[in-house]
Structure formats: structure tokens, C-alpha cells
Regions:
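Short, acidic, metal-binding catalytic loop of nucleotide-sugar glycosyltransferases
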Residues: 44-52
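Ser/Thr-glycine-rich phosphate-binding loops at phosphate-binding pockets of nucleotides
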Residues: 30, 57-67
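Boundary detector for helix-to-coil junctions that initiate low-complexity/charged tails
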Residues: 339-467
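N-proximal low-complexity "stem/linker" segments adjacent to membrane-targeting elements
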Residues: 1-44
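Short beta-strand/loop segment that forms part of the nucleotide-sugar
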Residues: 52-60, 80-81
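Catalytic-site signature of metal-activated, phosphate-bearing donor transferases
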Residues: 2, 90, 124-352
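Active-site-proximal specificity loops/subdomain of glycosyltransferases
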Residues: 66-113, 121-126
């Protein structure tokens, strides 16, 4: 079956072209170019998570990702040469290809659209399966789930140091840092214009920053909507935006292994070159990557504020992820059901009940601690904003004081000039008075009268001659 995206042919390379699956089963969708270093970790993670099928849409790769992905069952590989940054009727090629995947494989069912360097996980995935998560979302009629990207990194990273893909990616890249994370409330008018329903204020938050702010000096937007139920009204605008969505009351995580690319020999440079042409904003960002990576052969990433990931649930307790009481109640009920189904003759009953109760209390505590952590961070953020405003007012006050001092000095200088002019004017008046007196004295003298008489005689003589 041949299909097209904006006039570009979609070639089928491997795996089934049609994928039947139930409402509580998940297909993973991935638009990828040159993703061979990640592909095995990617496939193994999502199958271990419980995904039914994985679909790759390869965008003209030059490495071996297509052949590597084609080694696996329950994997479909497609290929298109539509340019990543090409504009087609005002929509870039990247978005067109993602929409194609969602509309073709996710119609009236759940799909997870992620990048090759993103590994999705959700709160209490150690307790409930992926099918249970999807049933919970269906029970609430949700059509979109928010996920926050979390950059993972090793203690140290040597730029351009690796030629072969790493085997234990998650083991080596096990650190994260929340010290430069910024959270901001979503604008209600913007959500209204997109016709999204977000019932939870804790979910209606955009997250930016993180370790890339430390290293490269910019705050990337970390909030995405990867898990979608395409019901015919929901619209995928971009990885960071949806329209006509009913957004779930919990957030999930995308463990992000972008820093791994920087360790691969020349890989990061090729990837950046491929993504140029996406507009001046993105070009400036990629220039920042290049500038830092060309100057530093080694990046010291692990700081005092860095933490080692043990479980996705850690991110609930430290406030990075959120979940509602309704979701926690679902997890509690699923755990209880699973225990009794696994061993219906469990004895003594009191021990099992006590175990379940302790687990419930622990999850309730985690939820409370997470909320307190977010409140503390918000309080600190407000204090920082307050301090910034105070400092700005002080600067304005100092600036105004300096201007007042400058005006005083100008006024004083003007007064001094006026006084000098007044003194000069007084001197001129005195000199003028002296000259007047001198002239009067001269006019009154005998010599002056004699001179005037001679002038009169001379004038008469001239007059006689003329006659």
C-alpha cells in the first residue's frame, strides 16, 4: 500500500501495514532520523512497558536504524523523504509526518507519539500496567495526557568520545537536576482558544529549563502531549500543543537522553545541521549548542543539586510530576485487586490488608509531600520575583536619585553661570558710567571748547569757499 504526505511517497519497509489493537492497548509512534544509537534501548523499553506495537517513520536516515529496527517483531518501519523543515501550506514537514502517524495508526484508540531519545513512564507503573492506565483514562473520558521531559545525564560527558552505541544507556545516564526548573501557569485565554479542558490546576502548568539551562544558557519548553486518543475532534498542533482535548489529571515523564547525542562522534553536529532551517529562533538555539560543544571537550554535568533516579515515583515525591486523588485511588484499587486475584486464598487476611493499607498511606504521603514541595518551590519562586521587583525598584530609585543629583548639579552650574553673567554685567555698567563721566569732563574742559570753536570756524570757511 502506497501513501503520500504532502506529495511525498511513504514507503513501507518492514512489518504489518495495519495494526489491530484494543482500546486498552497502545501503539508507539516515532518520527526518526539517524536514531540507531538509541533504537535498541527504545524498542526494549516500550515492549517492557507493555506497548502492543511500535511504528517508525524514518526521515531519510543515513545510519543503520532501518535495518536494526527491522530485526524486531511487532515493529513497522515506514520511510519518507519529506524534508523535516519543509513548509507545506503553512505547516512544517515534521508536524505533517507526526499527524500522518497519529491519524493513520491512532484513530479512535490510544497512541504514544515520542522521539527516539524519549522513554515514557507514568506514576506507579510498578503497580499498574499500561492497560490499566489506559482504562483509567477511558473511564474519565480523557483524550490527552501531559508529559514533562526530564534530561538525563552521566556524571561527566566527553564530547565526541564514542563511536559505538552504549549498551547500558539508562544505567549510565541516571542523573537528573531540577534546580533550574521553572513552572508557570497556563494562560486561561490560550487554553480556551484551543478548546482544551484541563480540570486540574496542578496539570495546567508549563515547565521550562533544567540542566540545558545550566549548560547552554536557554530554557527549553519541557511540557508535551505525547499520549493521545484521536477521537476525530482532538487535533495535534505540535508536540507541545493540542486542540479540542480533555487533558488528564496526572502528568507523566519523558526521560530524555539528548545528552547522549553529544557524546557520539560527530553525531550531534549532523543532527543539528539536519534541523537547521526551522526559523530564526531554533537556529539561534542550535548555534548555542554548537558554540558550547566546540569549546568544551568535557562537560561536568553532575552538581550538588543533581539526583539519581531510582523510580518514576521519585518524581511525584519531589513535585516534578503530579497526580490526583482519583488516580491514586485507582492505583490502590488495582493493587488490591491484583493481590487477591494472584492469591485468593491468602492467609492471614489481616497481613494482606495491613500491607495494602501501608501502601495506600505511603502513596497518600507521597502525594502530600509532592504538593508541599511544589508549594515550597512556588513560594521560593514568588520570593525571587519579589526580590527581583525590590531590586528593580531600588535600581529605579537609585537611578532617579542620580538623575536628581545631576539636575541639582546642572541647576547649581546654571546659577553659577547666572551669577558670573550678573557680575560681568555690573562691571560693564560701572565701566560705562566711568566712560560717561570722562566724556562729560572732557566736554566741560577749556581745551574741548577751543577745539569746538576751531571746528566751527573751519566749517564757516569751507562754506564761504563754496559760495
Amino acid at each position: 500500500m502506497k501513501e503520500q504526505i504532502a506529495g511525498f511517497e511513504v514507503e513501507h519497509v518492514h512489518g504489518p501495514e495495519e495494526i489491530p489493537y484494543k482500546r486498552d492497548e497502545l501503539v508507539v509512534l516515532c518520527l526518526v532520523r539517524d536514531g540507531e544509537p538509541w533504537v535498541r534501548s527504545f524498542i526494549e523499553h516500550y515492549f517492557s512497558l507493555g506497548a502492543k506495537h511500535i511504528v517508525f517513520l524514518d526521515n531519510d536516515s543515513t545510519d543503520g536504524i532501518v535495518s536494526t529496527a527491522s530485526e524486531y517483531d511487532n515493529v513497522t518501519v515506514l520511510r519518507s523523504k519529506l524534508a523535516f523543515g519543509a513548509g507545506v501550506e503553512g505547516i512544517v514537514g515534521e508536524r505533517l509526518m507526526r499527524r500522518y502517524l497519529i491519524e493513520r495508526f491512532g484513530s479512535n484508540r490510544w497512541s504514544l507519539c515520542v522521539d527516539i531519545d524519549e522513554l515514557f513512564d507514568y506514576p506507579y507503573s510498578d503497580v499498574i500496567g499500561l492497560d490499566s492506565l489506559l482504562r483509567y483514562l477511558d473511564s474519565k473520558s480523557y483524550t490527552a495526557v501531559t508529559a514533562q521531559m526530564l534530561d538525563m545525564f552521566p556524571e561527566k560527558l566527553s564530547v565526541n568520545s564514542r563511536q559505538e552505541p552504549i549498551k547500558g544507556l539508562r544505567d549510565e545516564y541516571r542523573f537528573y537536576d531540577l534546580s533550574r526548573i521553572d513552572r508557570s501557569r497556563m494562560r486561561k485565554d490560550k487554553d480556551a482558544s484551543r478548546n482544551n479542558i484541563i480540570e486540574s490546576d496542578e496539570v495546567a502548568v508549563r515547565v521550562r529549563g533544567g540542566i540545558r539551562d545550566n549548560v547552554f544558557g536557554f530554557k527549553p519548553l519541557l511540557t508535551k502531549y505525547p499520549l493521545l486518543f484521536s477521537d476525530g475532534t482532538l487535533e495535534h498542533i505540535s508536540v507541545h500543543a493540542v486542540r479540542n482535548a480533555r487533558v488528564a489529571d496526572l502528568t507523566c515523564v519523558l526521560f530524555h537522553y539528548k545528552f547522549y547525542a553529544f557524546a557520539l562522534e560527530d553525531y550531534w553536529y549532523r543532527a543539528i545541521e539536519h534541523k537547521r532551517g526551522r526559523g530564526p529562533f531554533m537556529n539561534r538555539r542550535y548555534e548555542q549548542y554548537v558554540e558550547v560543544l566546540e569549546k568544551n571537550t568535557e562537560l561536568q554535568l553532575k552538581l550538588e543539586s543533581s539526583r539519581e533516579i531510582a523510580s518514576v515515583n521519585d518524581l511525584l515525591e519531589n513535585g516534578f510530576l503530579v497526580a490526583s486523588e482519583g488516580y491514586i485511588g485507582w492505583v490502590d484499587a488495582e493493587e488490591e485487586k491484583n493481590i487477591w486475584q494472584a492469591d485468593p486464598q491468602s492467609k492471614p487476611y489481616e497481613l494482606a490488608a495491613a500491607f495494602l493499607e501501608s501502601r495506600r498511606l505511603a502513596r497518600a504521603k507521597t502525594l502530600t509531600v509532592g504538593r508541599l514541595e511544589r508549594q515550597l518551590l512556588e513560594h521560593r519562586r514568588q520570593e525571587q520575583i519579589k526580590d527581583q521587583r525590590i531590586n528593580k525598584l531600588k535600581e529605579q530609585r537609585d537611578s532617579q536619585g542620580q538623575k536628581i543629583q545631576e539636575l541639582k548639579e546642572q541647576w547649581l552650574d546654571r546659577d553659577q553661570k547666572i551669577q558670573r553673567l550678573q557680575r560681568k554685567q555690573q562691571r560693564l555698567r560701572k565701566r560705562n558710567d566711568r566712560l560717561k563721566k570722562q566724556r562729560a569732563n572732557v566736554a566741560a574742559s577749556r581745551t574741548w571748547r577751543l577745539v569746538e570753536g576751531l571746528h566751527r570756524i573751519k566749517a564757516k570757511a569751507l562754506d564761504v569757499r563754496k559760495r
